[in-house]
Amino acid sequence: MKIEFIQARDLPDAWFQCVYNIFDKGYEYTIDRGSFKGQKRIEYEYVVVQITHPGTRPLIPDIPPGCNVPPPTSMEYVEQYLEKLITSRKDVHETYTYGEDLEKQIDEVIRMYREEGLNTNQAYMAVGDASSILLEDPQCLRGIDTRIRYGKLHFMLYFRSWDLWAGFPSNLAGLQLLKEYMGKEIGVEDGEIIASSKGLHIYDYCWELAQTRTGRKK
């Protein structure tokens, strides 16, 4: 197994580096089970992404004029994703929302830090349960670990599977907004994001877009 380490200053930088490097470092295969069964994707075997200043604006990738590549996400979509992170409200067609698991845990983590002190390893927010494996499309984000160190709130994230092209920028922007909110409620500054996954991938229908955006396609 190859473990890739990527260090970036901000969220757009992290996205660009991951997209650029996956064509050299990724493993290409055909999906046997899961979303887009039968299609190909290229995937990091395991990746750790450290983002030192994730709050730097803009939070989402900026596509240069003339690149002829549609933006992978928008702040409007990020705000919709944030709502799914922090509230348990679920639409009829949805099998789950992250907020079902996170809503009460967010409040408890804030309370824990404010009332019991900053030096703890117990402020971890879990997503999913034993029944999640039976879902047709189980939750991709499986955990948000937190750490307050050097006066800042840091997030450590794990994704079991993660769409790099559009999911990565949307998810991290939404989680950054959540981290900023929690930091203000706790009374500390905003810190880093360290995200890891054994399934950060790009589907074959996005390969040409990704290669165009990163300058790999001439």
Describe these PLM feature segments.
Residues 1-218:
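Terminal, non-catalytic protein-protein interaction segments that mediate quaternary/complex assembly
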